[in-house]
Amino acid sequence: MSEGKEVKKPSARELAAFCEKVLDDHKAENIIRFDMEGLEWAQADCYIVCTGISAPHIGALAERVVREVRSEYALRPSAVDGDPQSKWIIADFGNVMIHVLTTEARERYQLEELWNDAPKEDCVRRLDEEHRRHEAEKE
């Protein structure tokens, strides 16, 4: 966070969108956001699930999100559970939970099936469309 910068607390959607961009910028794959708002059993308003290509990559992705959220919004996760060797890391920002998994762990735990009743969005597709629009505006 730069000196003198006013920090506003982001909404769950704003924080989720920021985290999705960070993950995409650092080569996370298959980024999906589940909008959990209004679901009684959900612990957060948004769950983000993404895949890293290796155990070290998921560690780097989780660290990068935590660092950039702290820099941009002065927020720290209430918990970061797991480690690269477990093949699944969760960063809990309260209203947004980020799940970073290896391909093997994502296939094993099938979180998309577990949360099937929640609306979901393919973030990679949306981010690609936003990037294309931004490039077209520059021309």
Go through the PLM ranges and name each one.
Residues 49-51:
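Short hydrophobic/aromatic beta-strand micro-patches
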Residues 44-46:
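Short amphipathic alpha-helical segments
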